[in-house]
């Protein structure tokens, strides 16, 4: 069985709840519907949880873990984190051991989501552009060639 990061397509199912301070998602194999992974946001402390329900939510620091559940294991294979930010976000992506794989740096003053994808040394390697709704994203290389897409489709 392929590991979570070896898959080219994954379906994401959000854990639904009222007044959630932390987000969680199941990662599903599109062919079988089997749960192959879990994404869990870690929010520590009562004060931080309460801030998640205010206008500061979009500026707050976050730490998200991607767990590979394939084959009965529960292994953190990826983390995504961001410190508190005022204007331009820098999101760090690391492997399960904490080694930085790259970063996303937000473009300042943009109506639709736009970010540069940086390698561990901070060099721009790709560009991520979303539509105005933030549902569909396209990764392009330095020459403008499409490298991949992320699409959100409402299924409920």
Where are these regions (language model features)?
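Intrinsically disordered, low-complexity proline/glycine-rich segments
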Residues: 1-156
């Amino acid at each position: 069985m392929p590991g979570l990061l070896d898959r080219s397509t994954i379906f994401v199912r959000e854990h639904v709840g009222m007044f959630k301070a932390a987000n969680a998602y199941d990662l599903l194999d599109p062919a079988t519907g089997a749960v192959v992974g879990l994404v869990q946001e870690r929010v520590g402390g009562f004060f931080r949880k309460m801030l998640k329900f205010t206008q500061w939510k979009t500026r707050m620091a976050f730490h998200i873990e991607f767990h590979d559940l394939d084959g009965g294991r529960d292994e953190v294979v990826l983390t995504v984190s961001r410190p508190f930010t005022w204007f331009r976000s820098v999101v760090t992506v690391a492997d399960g051991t904490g080694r930085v794989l790259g970063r996303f740096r937000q473009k300042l003053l943009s109506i639709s989501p736009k970010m540069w994808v940086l390698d561990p040394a901070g060099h721009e390697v790709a560009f991520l552009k979303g539509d105005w709704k933030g549902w569909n994203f396209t990764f392009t290389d330095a020459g403008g060639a499409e490298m991949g897409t992320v699409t959100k489709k409402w299924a409920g």
